[in-house]
């Protein structure tokens, strides 16, 4: 059952918030041991569900929250041994807003350590399996949230997207994932990876459910100086006819894709034309180089952000002789991928190489953004694959560069700050395939309106992996 359907039943008195919470908790306890979507569950869930006011706008809805988003009183690990026992004394703004409207945190979902990865294989605890094929990855780094949705272990989820970490797992697991305009959702309470790229984003099994989450979570926040003063009107934007829109298909993303992705793209273009959109091919010339710039800028910011985890003020304090030994032992707890990115970031920020790498990457970022702004003077939306292929088997991307290439089509939205939405667009065999839409800065609602039209025209909502009995 979809989140907005659950909410309607609660509002009519057909089911109580407690009954909804009990049903999802039972399903998680039965199915998640074989899936690994959750790192921890909210032990007070049923008590909170019994106390919630059923008249609140989100009463009856439980939310799976990625474990790099702070939850007061609930362990928040960022998928790392360094934060294995960290229980925040504060709440992320996005979570606080959902709870204020009656939603409940079901549990914390698995992720690649500190959000660094594209498969959830880099969690310090265990990998998450793809509900459509347990031998394949769910994507990352929000793989636990995507898998929980696909298996119907939760009706709603929060993830975070630094280079595609909401959209890529959404594509691999056949669900919807939105990377909002940078600043549209407060980052307060999000454990930082790369601060100029990070963005909390909603994940769901229908566009209407995304809108429900965004109306609750978005908006300005005095605790986040980068948050935008744009009032959320997502559910309102879904009403009425689809306006005539100009859709640009990004030429640089048309080659090198798997047969299923190519087929999904062709079918989607046919649907959008039938919906009245004018379609044309456009060029975003710098997009193929965006990945190289991203893997300079993101590690650079990570090396700065993660420097705080030395065991003195932040992070688990490992045993070691004197302060220096303690700091070395603490940082040895970082996983291999985190160490790799911190080393790269430290190198590109070093005095001898700063301009050659970091300075040039920042200049490229400005050019990429200028090209996108020029494109949106010609079209209203951009369409391209979320990933070049469906989910890959565990262990298939042991080469770090091969794993980094998973972000080929997604990093552009993060580098430019633009909103991007991945939506289910078909299958390759038994594996879901996703496409993504990009809109101009601040036009997140436009993405959802176009995706809803596609969803209604193709019945792409309600996708769910065949696990257990349906709720």
Curated annotation (Swiss-Prot):
Q: Keyword annotations for this protein?
A: ATP-binding, Ligase, Nucleotide-binding, Protein biosynthesis
Name the PROSITE patterns for this protein: AMIDASES
Task: Explain the purpose of this protein.
Answer: Allows the formation of correctly charged Gln-tRNA(Gln) through the transamidation of misacylated Glu-tRNA(Gln) in organisms which lack glutaminyl-tRNA synthetase. The reaction takes place in the presence of glutamine and ATP through an activated gamma-phospho-Glu-tRNA(Gln). Also acts on Asp-tRNA(Asn).
* Enzyme Commission number, as recorded: 6.3.5.7
Q: Where is the active site?
A: 66 (charge relay system), 141 (charge relay system), 165 (acyl-ester intermediate)
- Which GO cellular component term is one of those annotated? glutamyl-tRNA(Gln) amidotransferase complex
Q: Name one GO molecular function term.
A: glutaminyl-tRNA synthase (glutamine-hydrolyzing) activity
Any one GO biological process:
translation
Looking up PANTHER family in the UniProt record yields: GLUTAMYL-TRNA(GLN) AMIDOTRANSFERASE SUBUNIT A, TRANSAMIDASE
Self-association or partners: how does it assemble? Heterotrimer of A, B and C subunits.
Q: What is this protein called?
A: Glutamyl-tRNA(Gln) amidotransferase subunit A
Catalytic activity annotated for this protein? L-glutamyl-tRNA(Gln) + L-glutamine + ATP + H2O = L-glutaminyl-tRNA(Gln) + L-glutamate + ADP + phosphate + H(+)
The entry assigns this protein to a family as follows: Belongs to the amidase family. GatA subfamily.
Its source organism is: Thermus thermophilus (strain ATCC 27634 / DSM 579 / HB8)
Which InterPro entries does UniProt cross-reference here? Amidase, Amidase_CS, Amidase_dom, AS_sf, GatA
- According to its UniProt record, this protein's enzyme class is ligase
């Amino acid at each position: 059952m979809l989140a907005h359907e659950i909410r309607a039943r609660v509002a009519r008195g057909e089911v109580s918030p407690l009954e909804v919470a009990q049903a999802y908790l039972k399903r998680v306890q039965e199915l998640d041991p074989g899936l690994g979507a959750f790192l921890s569950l909210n032990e007070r869930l049923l008590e909170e569900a019994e106390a919630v006011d059923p008249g609140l706008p989100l009463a009856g809805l439980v939310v799976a929250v990625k474990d790099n988003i702070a939850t007061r009183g609930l362990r928040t690990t960022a998928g790392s041994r360094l934060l294995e026992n960290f229980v925040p004394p504060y709440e992320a703004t996005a979570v606080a807003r959902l709870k204020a409207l009656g939603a409940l945190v079901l549990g914390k979902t698995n992720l690649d350590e500190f959000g660094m990865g594209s498969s959830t294989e880099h969690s310090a605890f265990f990998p998450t399996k793809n509900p459509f094929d347990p031998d394949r990855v769910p994507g990352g780094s929000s793989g636990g949230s995507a898998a929980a949705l696909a298996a119907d272990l939760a009706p709603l989820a929060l993830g975070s997207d630094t280079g595609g970490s909401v959209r890529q797992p959404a594509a691999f697991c056949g669900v919807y994932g939105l990377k909002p305009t940078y600043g549209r959702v407060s980052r307060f309470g999000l454990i930082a990876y790369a601060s100029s790229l990070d963005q909390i984003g909603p994940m769901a099994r229908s566009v209407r459910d995304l809108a429900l989450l965004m109306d609750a979570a978005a908006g300005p926040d005095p605790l986040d100086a980068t948050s935008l003063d744009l009032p959320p009107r997502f559910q309102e934007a879904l009403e009425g006819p689809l306006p005539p829109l100009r859709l640009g298909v990004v030429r640089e993303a048309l080659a090198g894709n798997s047969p299923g992705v190519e087929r999904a793209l062709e079918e989607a273009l046919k649907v959008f034309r039938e919906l009245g959109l004018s379609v044309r091919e456009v060029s975003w010339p710098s997009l193929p180089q965006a990945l190289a710039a991203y893997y300079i800028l993101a590690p650079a910011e990570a090396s700065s952000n993660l420097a705080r985890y030395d065991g003195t003020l932040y992070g688990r304090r490992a045993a070691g002789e004197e302060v220096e030994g303690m700091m070395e032992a603490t940082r040895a707890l970082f996983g291999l991928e985190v160490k790799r990115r911190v080393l790269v970031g430290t190198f590109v920020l070093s005095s001898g190489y700063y301009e050659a790498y970091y300075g040039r990457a920042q200049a490229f970022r400005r050019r990429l953004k200028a090209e996108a702004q020029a494109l949106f003077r010609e079209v209203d939306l951009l369409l391209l694959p979320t990933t070049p292929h469906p989910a890959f088997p565990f262990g298939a991307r042991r080469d770090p560069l091969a794993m980094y290439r998973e972000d080929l089509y997604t990093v552009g939205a993060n580098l430019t700050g633009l909103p991007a939405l991945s939506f289910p667009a078909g299958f390759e065999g038994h594996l879901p395939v996703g496409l993504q839409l990009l809109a101009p800065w601040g036009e997140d609602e436009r993405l959802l309106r176009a995706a809803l039209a596609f969803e209604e025209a193709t019945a792409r909502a309600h996708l769910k992996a065949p696990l257990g009995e349906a709720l």
